[in-house]
From Swiss-Prot:
Cytoplasmic side: 1-36, 90-105
GO cellular component, one term: endoplasmic reticulum membrane
Organism from which the protein derives: Drosophila simulans (Fruit fly)
Alphabetical list of InterPro entries matching this protein: Vma21
Keyword Membrane attributed: yes
Transmembrane segments: 37-57, 69-89
Region feature Disordered, mapped onto this chain: 1-26
Name the record gives this protein: Vacuolar ATPase assembly integral membrane protein VMA21 homolog
Highest taxon in the source lineage: Eukaryota
Subcellular locations according to the entry: Endoplasmic reticulum membrane; Endoplasmic reticulum-Golgi intermediate compartment membrane; Cytoplasmic vesicle, COPII-coated vesicle membrane
UniProt KW keywords: Cytoplasmic vesicle, Endoplasmic reticulum, Membrane, Transmembrane, Transmembrane helix
Lineage of the organism: Eukaryota, Metazoa, Ecdysozoa, Arthropoda, Hexapoda
Amino acid sequence: MSTKNKKAAGGNGGAPKQTRQQSHDSQDYSSFKTVLFYCMLIVFLPVLTFFVLKGFVLDQFLDISEVKVNIASAVGAVVALHIALGLYIYRAYFGAPGSKGSKTD
């Protein structure tokens, strides 16, 4: 009779493990979304900045040579890259609000 009680009690212990696993999966998915966002920002922001500066801002509004337009656009893209990297490092160092992990045994 005691083995049946142990089996019945052990069967109910699976629910907290499943809830804990779902919590870990949710945290992993949130981390994945954050890293994916910053990767896309680091890749696409400088490219977008280069072409916006070159095509819309510098060529149309300023009367400067093509080489200077390319140089200014490249400098703008590098600045945009550094801003994106700085945002990523800031987020990684200080973390998101409420992301303090608690130790569970």
